[in-house]
């Protein structure tokens, strides 16, 4: 989700990042999700060097996999080396600096794992347009997503208009209203877990209303039919051991933002 500045940490000296070897140019082969029964939702949060998928880079991934009922199956997180001598972007937001990323894998070295766990699932994010935009740009460039493909998605920020009464749609405000724990804001895994909690809250409200035919249910059908992913299963298993989680928490609390009018 897009950054919202409010936190400043002491400046730390950056050391140049060492570019890693690029990912293979040819798309790997895949015959479907690693586990054909492993379907549901992939709740993702990305921390980035900026706001533009075309010019900025992913520097942290948090992923929480849910079954169709919203129960957590597994999760993982890693820092990502952007692969060039650049800084980490808005340190005051995500709390990361260049030296934090130096020993992390490049996106190409976790792409097969990421795509394997996204495949067959509806991608969920708070402000999905932002996170899915970065995934589309980055994974498409690595040959892991078909050109022009539209990833099936669920946006917990957009759904807040129908399932929340709070006037603000920012993640922290929605979590407070729903009683969902958020942990350290702008730490990718904590934010992904918070978005997963919001999805479960919306599901609960939907059941109470007797409304089962809603956006997140329909998205499962779209995800099952989506065939534009491409990955190497053996590489994905190897990449599981190369993840580098952040050392320490993210930003402890959220900024105050302009209020948004509810629909």
Language-model features: where?
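Acidic, Mg2+-coordinating catalytic module of metal-dependent nucleases/exonucleases
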Residues: 122-139, 169-239
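Conserved non-catalytic scaffold segment of RNase H-like nuclease domains
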Residues: 2-152, 164-186
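A generic structural signal for short hydrophobic patches within well-formed alpha-helices
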Residues: 159-160
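Acidic two-metal-ion nuclease catalytic site recognized across multiple nuclease folds
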Residues: 2-33, 198-263
């Amino acid at each position: 989700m897009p950054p919202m500045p409010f936190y400043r940490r002491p400046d730390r000296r950056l050391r140049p990042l060492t570019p890693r070897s690029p990912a293979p140019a040819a798309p790997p082969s895949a015959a479907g999700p690693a586990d054909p029964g492993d379907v549901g939702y992939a709740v993702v949060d990305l921390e980035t060097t900026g706001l533009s998928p075309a010019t900025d880079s992913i520097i942290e991934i948090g992923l929480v996999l849910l079954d169709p009922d919203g129960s957590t199956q597994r999760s993982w997180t890693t820092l990502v080396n952007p692969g060039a001598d650049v800084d980490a972007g808005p340190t005051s937001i995500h709390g990361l600096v260049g030296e934090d990323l130096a020993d992390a894998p490049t996106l190409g070295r976790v792409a097969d794992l990421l795509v394997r766990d996204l495949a067959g699932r509806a991608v969920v994010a708070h402000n999905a347009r932002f996170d899915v935009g970065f995934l589309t740009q980055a994974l498409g460039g690595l040959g892991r997503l078909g050109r022009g493909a539209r990833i099936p998605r669920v946006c917990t920020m957009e759904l807040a208009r129908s399932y929340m009464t709070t006037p603000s749609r920012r993640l922290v405000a929605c979590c407070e209203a729903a009683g969902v724990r958020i942990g350290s804001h702008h730490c990718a895994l904590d934010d992904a877990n918070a978005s997963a909690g919001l999805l479960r809250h919306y599901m609960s409200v939907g059941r109470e209303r007797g409304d089962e035919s809603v956006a997140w249910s329909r998205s499962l059908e779209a995800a099952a039919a989506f065939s534009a992913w491409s990955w190497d299963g053996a590489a994905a298993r190897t990449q599981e051991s190369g993840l580098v989680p952040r050392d320490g928490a993210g930003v402890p609390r959220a900024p105050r933002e302009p209020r948004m009018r509810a629909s």
